[in-house]
């Protein structure tokens, strides 16, 4: 099954993925790899002397144009069974079989990225980045667990030649194992993950940062603990991007992974650091203009879960516009009566945070709705006094 254009463009309260719980493999909504696409080695030669910003723009262009190997477009189902407060839950989520790469199954290049670029791709492909707990779960479920291949630290570890060197070390292991890169198997041990974490926005750093974790030597034995000391523009050879479908199944019903991470009763399924109210990285200014080059990209607009949630009495609503649009953001009660319009007018492409002060309203469930051109999406929030 493949993510449909309509499904990933218009997300509503009731999410209807065009696959079922019986599908063990699904695919990213990107084009088939073009016949004339660059190989991994050719792409390395093209970007090795570029600035990091121009390199990341080139990376996004290649990936959204479909120039990725099969393991970077296939997502495999993982099932979690857990009891919470006496209730039994079965969650099925979908993870890329391996980290993002550019090229073919035979000639590919694992490409480290900054977190904003990884988030840009996730947003455009209806995906999310993993949490620490999800990284552990994915590794434990990996059919092939490779030995990490560290390269001695140096000033060149953030350069394309060292990225390419590390890709070669990983390929050697696959060749020695006789592993078929087109197989439907999850691979672990190849990279550290860029993860979603409360440490993205924590007060222990006064700068935007990337949070990394993983590179397991074995079960419960990662080389890299959770770390948020690197600036957001840092990416070295050991960093990898493994996308997770934002659409999943909980007890047979379709859900969003992002919503699970922000819900008081469910976060424990996928997080071991509590609720993650902002399960995403800040947008990158230098990538915003790229949306105009991908008119058929799956997501033009996105409404995220408010934070905090539950809240008392103020909360923040975040949404993303990939192009200029006439926008209306309103709050309704459960009877469908409009209580307040928070935004009304034309806005440029970008990421927006809108505060709502519910001081004059009673405790309860409220609905906030975003309209932007032909897009419309609603979410629920809880005022708890």
Each language-model region and where it sits:
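Disulfide-stabilized, aromatic/cysteine-rich ligand-recognition loop
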Residues: 109-113, 127, 215-287, 382
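Extracellular C-type lectin-like domains
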Residues: 170-238
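C-terminal outer-membrane/trafficking sorting elements
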Residues: 292-385
């Amino acid at each position: 099954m493949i993510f449909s254009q309509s499904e990933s463009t218009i997300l509503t309260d009731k999410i209807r993925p065009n696959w079922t719980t019986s599908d063990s493999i699904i695919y990213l909504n990107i084009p088939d790899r073009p016949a004339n696409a660059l190989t991994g080695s050719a792409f390395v030669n093209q970007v090795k002397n570029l600035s990091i910003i121009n390199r990341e723009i080139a990376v996004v262009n290649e990936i959204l144009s479909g120039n990725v190997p099969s393991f970077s477009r296939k997502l495999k189902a993982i099932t979690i069974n857990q009891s919470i407060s006496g209730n039994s839950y079965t969650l099925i989520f979908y993870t890329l079989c391996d980290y993002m790469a550019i090229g073919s199954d035979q000639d590919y290049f694992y490409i480290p990225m900054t977190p904003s670029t990884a988030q840009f791709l996730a947003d455009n492909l209806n995906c999310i980045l993993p949490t620490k707990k999800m990284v552990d779960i994915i590794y434990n479920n990996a059919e092939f667990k490779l030995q990490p291949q560290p390269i001695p630290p140096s000033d060149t570890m953030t350069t394309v030649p060292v990225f390419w060197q590390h890709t070669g070390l990983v390929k050697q292991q696959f060749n020695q194992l006789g592993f078929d890169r087109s197989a439907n198997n999850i691979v672990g041990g190849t990279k550290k993950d860029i993860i979603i974490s409360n440490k993205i926005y924590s007060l222990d750093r006064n700068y935007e940062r990337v949070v990394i974790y993983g590179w397991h030597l074995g079960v419960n034995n990662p080389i890299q603990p959770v770390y948020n000391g690197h600036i957001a523009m840092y990416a070295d050879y050991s960093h990898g991007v493994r996308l997770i479908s934002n659409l999943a199944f909980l007890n047979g019903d379709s859900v969003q992974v992002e919503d699970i991470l922000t819900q008081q009763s469910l976060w424990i399924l996928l997080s071991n650091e509590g609720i993650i109210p902002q399960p995403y990285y800040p947008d990158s200014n230098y990538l915003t203009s790229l949306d105009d080059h991908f008119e058929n990209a799956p997501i033009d607009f996105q409404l995220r879960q408010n934070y905090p949630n539950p809240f008392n009495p103020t909360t923040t609503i975040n949404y993303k516009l990939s192009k200029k649009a006439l926008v209306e953001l309103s709050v309704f009660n459960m009877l469908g009566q409009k209580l307040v319009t928070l935004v009304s007018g034309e806005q440029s492409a970008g990421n927006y945070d809108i505060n709502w002060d519910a001081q004059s309203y009673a405790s309860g469930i409220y609905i906030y709705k975003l309209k932007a051109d032909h897009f419309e999406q609603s979410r629920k929030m809880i005022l708890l006094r």
